[in-house]
Regions:
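Short acidic-glycine motifs
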Residues: 21-41, 46, 50-821
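Cleavable N-terminal targeting peptides that direct proteins into the secretory/outer-membrane pathway or into
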Residues: 1-22
Length: 821
């Protein structure tokens, strides 16, 4: 094992990467033959794009093959082929998509035939060398298809086997929603803390729709170049300038008249939304230096339709029910003044600014440089809650002001040492700061910042229980290098990808205290009698400790892969990737459980991958693939292991107001002699390993017409070593108790016997729960995906897809979701 790792490291260090289509780029390749089908070595091939100033001069090898890797995705490519004794071949107006290996089968006629071959658009609808399951959402689709809010990553849902997960708009690939990778021009912009796209789902959009040229969605079996994702990959390419100046301006407007009423709202709340921006791109120096710039703003006002629908506690007019003696009329009237703010339209806005800039410099044919920067600032008053209508009181009682700041930059250098070698180096910088705070405009005198529940009605406090918080402030630096080398029938690739992510979190739920009152009368007395020290609450909770924590994860990735053209009809893509994440270790531990001081980093993360593409007759293709894909460690997991050790943070839980040290409403405890019997300790299993998935595909693709294709795919996914939580503090079960089962009329119709669980039987009575995070979760996913694509021609383009899927899992999602195991 160590020898294999050493070999990978040495090869990566010496030659960095051999490649076909590097992330954020595409490639053009082909084989040149004569009329009899024999290959033609030594033919001169020129790949060019006049608008981008790109020229690549190549020579076919002994197998008649040529490859031009690391090309900028764009329209307008041309390929010319010259060989002594043969007529020139010329293909024009080729469109190269991100992640695509545009393969051309070129036949040359003898020189006696004076006709020049010219192809206006030779892009095949069946890609003969492709082995993954992917789709490109192109420039025309992005520009022409309608989209709500101009959030461009919503187009990902046009891909088979991809769907929304939950209520927040996360993307689920093959049933996996928590381990996807999001790349912009090859640089990782995934927020590692939650394993979601930068800015998450609260923002309007991470990138302006007008700044995106296209993106590739890899839903299954990507090559070894891609890592840190056991789900899917979204590979976005931004727009660049060219030799012609192009610009645009836009303004979009929406209001209540144009919006339908929410089905759960009692009225259609007012909304006014403006989105405006501009884009411009062109040359600074023709064929050498190009620029592109985009700016966009959003101003949105969309109040929340708020109410409290709990008739046993609050009447429709907004008054407490059941307040009486021993509370005085004045005390009952005092708490009634709290409620009107929960009814009606709660002000809410969402304002965002986006700026994007890019420079591309090609000083020579063999060197090109690119630099880009993206700026996002999002601020939303009362924007933690995003629903149009809320009837639980959470529009105030579990809400607050939200802000998101995302910055990311990229530098890349592509060099061509020879006609068969291309090297691409990139540096990425990424920050994502998400902060929430109380809204002072909805504060009520006498409540403070406590969490409040009265007679079962929650969300009566001043805001969400965790406010204020920074969750997280993430910063990442990334270095990656890829070098492509064509040797005979092999297009090989090795690479290295190093990233260091630092998360700062300031977050501790219920640190201001949480009061629960059993009835309205008790709350009315305490609300007006706090100066006299009244304590009539039913229970009280508060988290004590340190709210902030800093986590640094250093990810290392190395890979080797090869695209082998075995025959003109058979292509093999095979490779291996190794990943290692150096995890931070807790500085504060629980002496009762030394396990709280260590988090194991999985080291056996070798991931072999194999893909096969076989062309039956040029119009029918069979693909198959299999591979292992490791997930990245989320900051949510590490934060929980750092803070939930009963020392870093601990929770006081008082079940009676008779405690002398109990607080007087709305005060909180400043210090406490914590009784450990009410706390939880959590740690990682000593043999914790990296979760991964096994992915397999089998697909049949058929070209039905010149611009019409049909694909039928079987997708298989097995999640292995997923993270779950097991309580080690469960002791022996108590005596068996028999319960009688009655029907609606009270007649006994059966019995049910079950053993009892007694808290007194805990293994360690000092703690309520002792949780161990371990690899105990597995999942299975099987799907049949059918897609028909009509490529743009004669003013029409269409794509129709249907996915039938069956998923079985213990519980999927982020580690945060799995805490209930």
């Amino acid at each position: 094992m160590k020898r294999i790792l050493l070999f990978v490291l040495l090869v990566a260090a010496c030659s960095a990467a051999f490649a076909q289509s590097t992330a954020g780029f595409g490639s053009i390749s082909g084989v040149v033959r004569d009329a009899s089908g024999a290959v033609i070595p030594g033919a001169k091939v020129a790949v060019s794009n006049e608008s981008k100033g790109i020229v690549r001069n190549l020579i076919t090898n002994d197998a008649g093959l040529f490859t031009a890797p690391a090309l900028v995705p764009a329209q307008g490519y041309a390929v010319t082929v010259d060989a002594e004794g043969f007529t020139r071949y010329e293909a024009k107006s080729l469109e190269l998509l991100v992640g695509q290996d545009l393969n051309l089968n070129i036949g040359l006629s003898v020189a006696a035939a004076t006709v020049q071959v010219e192809v206006t658009t030779a892009t095949p609808i069946v890609e003969e060398t492709k082995t993954d399951v992917s789709q490109v959402i192109g420039e025309q689709q992005i520009a022409e298809l309608p989209i709500n809010g101009r959030r461009v990553d919503s187009f990902v849902l046009l891909t088979p086997a991809v769907t929304n997960d939950g209520t927040y708009g996360n993307l689920s690939f093959r049933g996996m929603a928590a381990s996807n990778a999001f790349l912009v021009d090859g640089v990782d912009t995934t927020q590692q803390f939650f394993n979601e796209n930068a800015g998450r789902t609260r923002i309007a959009s991470q990138l302006s729709q007008d700044a995106v040229q296209e993106f590739q969605v890899v839903s299954s079996n990507p090559t070894a170049e891609y890592g840190r994702a056991s789900g899917g990959i979204v590979n976005t390419v931004t727009r660049s300038g060219g030799n012609d100046v192009h610009g645009s301006g836009y303004w979009f407007f929406r209001n209540r008249t144009l919006n339908a009423q929410d089905r759960y709202a009692t009225f259609n709340p007012p909304e006014v939304r403006h989105q405006a921006g501009f884009s411009i791109g062109g040359p600074v120096k023709k064929d050498k230096l190009f620029y592109f710039f985009n700016g966009e703003i959003q101003r949105r006002n969309f109040p929340i339709a708020s109410s409290i629908n709990r008739p046993a506690v609050i009447d429709p007019s907004g008054h407490f029910i059941g307040c009486g003696a021993p509370a005085t009329p004045a005390q009952c009237a005092a708490i009634d003044r709290l409620l009107p703010r929960y009814f009606g339209a709660i002000p809410r806005n969402a304002n965002q600014e986006l700026l994007f800039g890019k420079l591309d410099w090609r000083p020579t044919e063999r060197h090109s440089f690119s630099a880009s920067f993206n700026f996002l600032h999002f601020l939303s008053m009362n924007g933690i809650q995003t629903s149009a209508a809320i009837n639980t009181g959470a529009a105030i009682g579990s809400n607050g002001n939200a802000s998101v700041r995302v910055r990311n930059g990229r530098l890349s250098w592509t060099s061509i040492p020879s006609n068969t070698v291309v090297n691409e180096f990139r540096f990425g910088w990424f920050t994502d700061r998400q902060a929430d705070d109380f809204n002072p405009d909805v504060q009520t005198a006498g409540l403070g910042y406590v969490v409040l529940s009265v007679a079962g009605q929650s969300y009566l406090g001043a805001g969400a229980s965790y406010l204020p918080r920074v969750n997280p402030n993430e910063r990442r630096f990334q270095f990656a290098d890829n070098l492509s080398w064509t040797l005979g029938k092999h297009a090989m690739k090795f690479g290295v990808d190093i990233a260091s992510s630092r998360d700062y979190i300031y977050n501790m739920s219920e640190r201001h205290g949480s009061y629960v009152y059993g009835n309205v009368t008790a709350f009315a007395q305490d609300f007006s009698d706090n100066a006299a020290g009244g304590k009539r609450w039913q229970s009280y909770r508060q988290t004590l400790g340190t709210p902030d924590v800093t986590l640094t994860i250093r990810d290392h990735g190395f890979y080797a892969q090869d695209q082998y053209r075995v025959t003109p009809r058979l292509t093999l893509n095979y490779g291996v990737r190794y990943e290692y994440a150096a995890l931070p270790q807790p500085a504060i531990t629980n002496p009762d459980y030394p396990q709280t001081g260590r988090i194991a980093s999985g080291k056996r993360n070798f991931a072999p991958r194999l893909g096969i593409a076989f062309s039956i007759n040029g119009k029918t293709l069979v693909r198959a693939g299999y591979g292992l894909y490791h997930a990245r460690y989320s900051g949510v997991l590490l934060q929980s292991l750092f803070t939930n050790n009963a020392v870093y943070q601990s929770q006081v839980s008082l079940t009676s107001s008779n405690y002398a040290a109990g607080p007087v409403f709305p005060n909180r405890l400043e210090a406490s002699n914590l009784a450990r019997g009410g706390t939880t300790v959590e740690f990682a299993a000593p043999d914790l390993r990296t979760p991964y998935t096994q992915q397999g595909t089998l697909a049949l693709e058929r070209q039905l017409a010149a611009n019409l294709g049909l694909t039928v795919s079987y997708l298989w996914n097995r999640g292995v070593q997923g993270l779950g939580v097991r309580d080690l503090n469960i002791g022996p079960l108590g005596p068996v108790v028999t319960y009688r089962i009655a029907d609606a009329g009270g007649n006994i119709v059966g019995a049910y016997a079950s053993p009892t669980y007694l808290l007194a039987n805990r293994v360690d009575r000092r703690y309520t729960r002792i949780l161990q995070v371990e690899n105990g979760v597995n999942s299975y996913y099987n799907a049949l995906a059918v897609q028909m694509r009509k490529r743009y021609s004669k003013g029409f383009q269409a794509s129709v897809a249907y996915t039938w899927a069956h998923a079985i899992d213990y519980k999927q999602g982020t580690y945060q979701d799995n805490l209930g195991f």
